[in-house]
From Swiss-Prot:
Family (UniProt): Belongs to the UreE family.
Function (record text): Involved in urease metallocenter assembly. Binds nickel. Probably functions as a nickel donor during metallocenter assembly.
Coiled-coil stretches: none
Keywords for this protein: Chaperone, Cytoplasm, Nickel, Nickel insertion
Gene Ontology CC terms, in alphabetical order: cytoplasm
InterPro entries from the UniProt entry: UreE, UreE_C_dom, UreE_N, UreE_N_sf
HAMAP family: UreE (MF_00822)
Main location: cytoplasm
Keyword Chaperone found: yes
Naturally occurring in which organism (per UniProt): Cereibacter sphaeroides (strain ATCC 17023 / DSM 158 / JCM 6121 / CCUG 31486 / LMG 2827 / NBRC 12203 / NCIMB 8253 / ATH 2.4.1.) (Rhodobacter sphaeroides)
Segments of skewed composition (Basic and acidic residues): 146-162
Protein location: Cytoplasm
Protein name, as recorded: Urease accessory protein UreE
C-alpha cells in the first residue's frame, strides 16, 4: 500500500504564487475540515492533516510535504440566487445565521425551502442555480458562519442566558407618580 502525500500546511490566497500541481474542488460543507483524504481533479490522492479544523477559502492551497501545491476551488452546488430588494433580504438571511454570498445585485444562498418561501413572501425573486458557492466569512475573523439551530436534534441543551431589561423613567413635570415614595 502506497502512503499518501500529506498536507499539513494551508496557504491563503496571495501567500503562494506559480502554478499549482493540482486542484481540488470542494463544496461549502467539504471546505470545513481538519483531517481528510482528498483527490485532485486528476485523481491524485493526498491526506490533509491540519492542526485544527479550518474553513478553506477558494484560492488557498494545501502545501504537500514534498513542496507541491494543491489549489482549493469551490465546487458547483445547488443554490438559489435572490434578487429584488436585497437589503431587507440580507437582514432576514443574516438573522438566521445562514451562509450567504453577497454580490452587488444579488444574494446567493443554499437551497432551503422554508427560507425560500419567506423570501418570496417578502417580494423577492428567486432563481435556482447550480454554481460554486462562496459565502462571506463569519464575523470576528472566524472565516465561517455556523448556523444556530434551535431544534431538539442538536444533542446539546439550550440554556443560553436570557436577559430581560425593564426600563423606568422619572415622571415628567406634568405626570404624577402612581405611588408616593415618601
Amino acid at each position: 500500500m502506497t502512503e499518501l502525500p500529506q498536507a499539513r500546511r494551508l496557504l491563503k490566497q496571495g501567500e503562494w504564487t506559480g502554478p499549482a500541481a493540482g486542484c481540488v474542488r470542494l463544496g461549502y460543507d467539504e471546505r470545513f475540515l481538519r483531517r481528510k483524504r482528498l483527490e485532485t481533479e486528476a485523481g491524485d490522492g493526498f491526506l490533509v492533516d491540519l492542526a485544527e479544523t479550518t474553513s478553506l477559502d477558494e484560492g488557498c492551497a494545501f502545501e504537500l510535504a514534498d513542496g507541491r501545491l494543491v489549489e482549493v476551488r469551490a465546487a458547483e452546488e445547488e443554490v438559489v440566487a435572490v434578487t429584488g430588494p436585497i437589503l431587507r433580504a440580507a437582514w432576514h438571511i443574516g438573522n438566521r445565521h445562514t451562509p450567504c454570498q453577497i454580490e452587488a445585485d444579488r444574494l446567493v444562498i443554499r437551497r432551503d425551502h422554508v427560507l425560500e418561501e419567506m423570501l418570496r413572501g417578502l417580494g423577492l425573486t428567486l432563481e435556482p442555480r447550480t454554481e460554486p458557492f462562496r459565502p462571506e466569512g463569519g464575523a470576528y475573523g472566524h472565516g465561517r458562519t455556523l448556523g444556530h439551530d434551535h431544534g431538539p436534534a442538536q444533542g446539546h441543551g439550550h440554556d443560553h442566558p436570557h436577559v430581560h431589561v425593564h426600563i423606568s423613567h422619572k415622571p415628567d413635570e406634568d405626570e404624577t407618580p402612581d405611588a408616593d415614595p415618601a
